[in-house]
Curated annotation (Swiss-Prot):
<keyword id="KW-0472">Membrane</keyword>
<dbReference type="Pfam" id="PF22919">
    <property type="entry name" value="ATP-synt_VA_C"/>
</dbReference>
<comment type="similarity">
    <text>Belongs to the ATPase alpha/beta chains family.</text>
</comment>
<protein>
    <recommendedName>
        <fullName>ATP synthase subunit beta</fullName>
        <ecNumber>7.1.2.2</ecNumber>
    </recommendedName>
</protein>
<keyword id="KW-0375">Hydrogen ion transport</keyword>
<comment type="subunit">
    <text>F-type ATPases have 2 components, CF(1) - the catalytic core - and CF(0) - the membrane proton channel. CF(1) has five subunits: alpha(3), beta(3), gamma(1), delta(1), epsilon(1). CF(0) has three main subunits: a(1), b(2) and c(9-12). The alpha and beta chains form an alternating ring which encloses part of the gamma chain. CF(1) is attached to CF(0) by a central stalk formed by the gamma and epsilon chains, while a peripheral stalk is formed by the delta and b chains.</text>
</comment>
<dbReference type="InterPro" id="IPR024034">
    <property type="entry name" value="ATPase_F1/V1_b/a_C"/>
</dbReference>
<dbReference type="GO" id="GO:0005886">
    <property type="term" value="C:plasma membrane"/>
</dbReference>
<dbReference type="GO" id="GO:0045259">
    <property type="term" value="C:proton-transporting ATP synthase complex"/>
</dbReference>
<keyword id="KW-0139">CF(1)</keyword>
<keyword id="KW-0066">ATP synthesis</keyword>
<dbReference type="InterPro" id="IPR020003">
    <property type="entry name" value="ATPase_a/bsu_AS"/>
</dbReference>
<keyword id="KW-1278">Translocase</keyword>
<dbReference type="InterPro" id="IPR000194">
    <property type="entry name" value="ATPase_F1/V1/A1_a/bsu_nucl-bd"/>
</dbReference>
<comment type="function">
    <text>Produces ATP from ADP in the presence of a proton gradient across the membrane. The catalytic sites are hosted primarily by the beta subunits.</text>
</comment>
<dbReference type="Pfam" id="PF00006">
    <property type="entry name" value="ATP-synt_ab"/>
</dbReference>
<dbReference type="Pfam" id="PF02874">
    <property type="entry name" value="ATP-synt_ab_N"/>
</dbReference>
């Protein structure tokens, strides 16, 4: 599918009219006159009446089943739809608004605004949600690190500009705050835009997110699209494409670096499985759709860097029953460049962002990409933390005093590293009262080198808590000395 622009005037154009012949839940069969059969993925419009009110319903053509009949998936409940109801073929795929008009607003899968009066929104351009990925010649050949200014991310799990990051974490470990912080930093440090796609979001979660983003002052820089948990599977399957299409416009037309959040990518696979079952396809492993890898690839291949500009994606990944071999998360992992795992144990100690430094990974934590000094420092930090983890059982039974002198030093430095990995964030300022900080990667590497070398062994570990660079540690240490 090309990047054809669909103007607001042509989005409701009718190129053919058919009639509903069968409705089974969200699956609708529609018969068209000979020669007017709509193409696969075309959007069809139907008006259904429920309790005296007429509702517009959008269908998407999924199959041609013969005898001038198409099988379509409804993106809204099919209540009120009857046999013989008129169906209008738009002659084009579902299209959504793109551009600055999307920022600060909440949209559904078909591009209807949800948090404002539609008459107050002036949409000048729409793009179809089904588009080809960038041509190979247009891709950015160099791998570049996205410097976030967050120490733990930049040092231990560096993000690729135009890459895909998997975000793992249960409820209450700081996932939403980290998402908001990344949106803030992309807007203020890079002048970029963020798009949030809620795939199968709980209504309460979506509402809380919008309110929190508004309070944090990042809503104005963000376009939000939601296909909620109570909506038909067709909506949940396509909502990620709606968000991605908006992000592609910011990248390709406005030449911005874009941050795309998908929460939750597992529900994208789950919705595809439901649609596949509704269409009568033979299930594959563990009941998933046979085209799982294909559907995932069509989404992920569009998330990339073109020359000079990028879409960087953070995708929340739910792992069913913590089974990493499940086909849905396993298919997602094949596309990820970095994984950021949020730890409940670290969060319980009040250390935020609660990123687990030992289980989080990155493809570019390699001297070839980040440089030898960065790589050596990250490796040394991980070795100290790993040794500290191994010593915890001994400490729990015998106490720190029974350790060798070398191990005592290791534990003391590990505790300073753990404290120094915490950082004051901009969006959490209202909770902590501490202003946010952006730490350049060179300062981050130098700070952790000082801890690993023992240059700051004389400074109490409290001075390292919730700070930015090592300069702030020194300021805290000076205050502590003055206070006696």
């Amino acid at each position: 599918m090309t990047a054809t622009t669909i103007t607001p005037e042509t989005k409701d154009e009718v190129v053919g009219v058919g009639r509903v012949v069968r409705v089974i839940g969200p699956v609708v069969d529609v018969e068209f006159p000979a020669g007017q059969l709509p193409e696969i993925l075309n959007a069809l419009h139907v008006d259904a009446e429920v309790m005296g009110e007429t509702h517009a319903i959008t269908l998407e053509v999924a199959l041609h089943i013969g005898e001038n009949v198409v099988r379509a998936i409804s993106l809204k409940p099919t209540d009120g739809m009857r046999r013989g109801t008129e169906v209008r073929d738009t002659g084009a795929p579902i299209s959504v608004p793109v551009g600055d008009v999307t920022k600060g607003h909440v949209w559904n899968v078909t591009g209807d605004v949800l948090n404002a009066d539609p008459s107050t929104i002036e949409v000048t351009e729409r793009w179809p949600i089904h588009r080809d990925p960038p041509a190979f010649d247009d891709l950015e050949p160099e791998t570049e690190m996205l410097e976030t200014g967050i120490k733990v991310l930049d040092l231990l799990t560096p993000y690729v500009k135009g890459g895909k990051i998997g975000l793992f974490g249960g409820a209450g470990v700081g996932k939403t705050v980290l998402i908001q912080e990344m949106i803030y930093r992309i807007a203020h440090n890079f002048g970029g835009t963020s798009v949030f796609a809620g795939v199968g979001e709980r209504t309460r979660e979506g509402n809380d997110l919008i309110n929190e983003m508004d309070e944090a002052g990042v809503l104005k820089d963000t376009a939000l699209v939601f296909g909620q948990m109570d909506e038909p599977p067709g909506t949940r399957l396509r909502i990620a494409l709606t968000g991605l299409t908006m992000a592609e416009y910011f990248r390709d037309v406005q030449n911005q670096d874009v941050l795309l959040f998908i929460d939750n990518i597992f529900r994208f696979s789950q919705a595809g499985s439901e649609v596949s079952t509704l269409l009568g396809r033979m299930p594959s492993a563990v009941g998933y759709q046979p085209n799982l890898a294909d559907e995932m690839g069509q989404l992920q291949e569009r998330i990339t860097s073109t020359r000079g500009h990028s879409i960087t994606s953070m995708q929340a990944v739910y792992v069913p029953a913590d089974d990493y071999t499940d086909p849905a998360p396993a298919t997602t992992f094949a596309h990820l460049d970095a994984t950021t795992e949020l730890s409940r144990e670290i969060a319980s100690r009040g250390l935020y962002p609660a990123v687990d430094p030992l289980t989080s990974t990155s493809r570019i934590l390699d001297p070839l990409y980040v440089g030898q000094e960065h790589y050596d420092t990250a490796t040394q930090v991980k070795q100290i933390l790993q040794r500290n983890k191994e010593l915890q059982d001994i400490i729990a039974i015998l106490g720190v005093d029974e350790l060798s002198e070398e191990d005592k030093v290791t534990v003391a430095r590990a505790r300073r590293i753990q404290q120094f990995l915490s950082q004051n964030t901009y969006t959490a300022e209202k909770f902590t009262g501490v202003a946010g900080s952006t730490v350049p990667i060179a300062d981050t590497v130098e700070g952790f080198q000082m801890i690993c070398r023992g240059d700051v062994d004389h400074i109490p570990e409290q001075a390292f808590f919730n700070v930015g660079s090592m300069d702030m540690v020194m300021e805290n240490w000076d205050k502590m000395k003055k206070e006696g």
